[in-house]
Amino acid sequence: MRFTKMHGIGNDYVYVDCFRQQVEDPSALAKAVSDRHFGIGGDGLILILPSQAADVRMRMFNADGSEGQMCGNGVRCLAKYAYDHGLARTNPIRVETAAGIRVIDLQLDGSGRVAATTVDMGEPILEAERIPVNYPQKRVIDMPLRAGQRAFGMTCVSMGNPHAVIYVDHVAAVALEQVGPEIEANPLFPQRINVHFVQVLSPSEVTMRTWERGSGVTLACGTGASAVCVAGVLTGKTGRSITAHLPGGDLKLQWRESNNHVYMTGPAVEVFSGDWPD
C-alpha cells in the first residue's frame, strides 16, 4: 500500500490515496501505522476518496482506530495533496467530510505547489445538546469542572467535533497527560471530548496545549484552535481574530460576524512517501 506522511504544524497523519487503491480495514490500519515505534508514526490515518458532493472526500481515523468527524490540520494537508498530485486542480478545493463540506483556499509557492491553506471551518455549534454535553443550560460557557484535584472553568464548542476550552494562567504548568484523559472520559461528554488548555497573551494572541480525543497529546489541533477562537469571544477574553501558538507552530483564526464562519490559516507539509506491507 502506497502512503504519504504529511503534517500541519506537527499534527501529522498518514494519508492513503484511495483514488488509486483500496483500504479494507481502515480502523486496524490506523492503529498499526500510527504507532510511533512499530509503525510509520502519526496522530492517525486519513483516506483520500472520490466524492459525488465535492472535489474529494476525507475519512479520518484516530490513532486508537476510532473514526473522527473532522480534523482542521488534516483537511488542509489533504487539500495540498489533492492539488499537488492532480486529484483536483481547482482553487479553492471543496472537501467532503463527516462534518460537512469544507472549502479550502490554496496559497501556492513559486513552483506552483501548495505552501499554505485557509480553511472555511464553517459555523460553530454552541448548543449543549448538539455538541454534545450533558448540561441543563443551552450553552456551556465557563462551566465549573473538577479534574486532577483542581477546579476549572470550561467552555464547550463543536466544530463538527466536540471541544472543551479551559483558560489557565500558565498553560505549561498543566499536567496535561493526567487531566486530559480524565476530562475526555468524563460522563458529561457522551461522545468523549477534545481538551484544550489556553493561556491568553493579549486580546489577539493565545498559547494552547491539546489533549485530542482518541490520540492523546498532539502538537496541534486545527478544529481545537478554531474552538478556542470562538470560546475567546464567548468569554470576552479575546477578539474575533487571533494567532494561536501551539507546540507545533502557529495558526491564524478568525470568527467572522458577516457569516458566522470560522477561518483557519496555516502551512501544510508533505514529509515523505513510502510503501506499507499489505
Regions found by a protein language model. Give the residues of each.
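Glycine-rich beta-alpha junction loops
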Residues: 123-125, 159-163, 268
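Membrane-interfacial helix-loop segments of redox and metal-homeostasis proteins
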Residues: 157-159, 181
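N-terminal, positively charged, Ser/Thr/Ala/Gly-biased leader segments
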Residues: 1-22, 119, 136-148, 152-157
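A glycine-rich beta-to-alpha transition motif near the start of alpha/beta enzyme domains, typified by
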Residues: 1-113, 164-278
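Juxtamembrane transmembrane-helix boundary motif
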Residues: 92-94, 101-103, 107-147, 151-154, ...
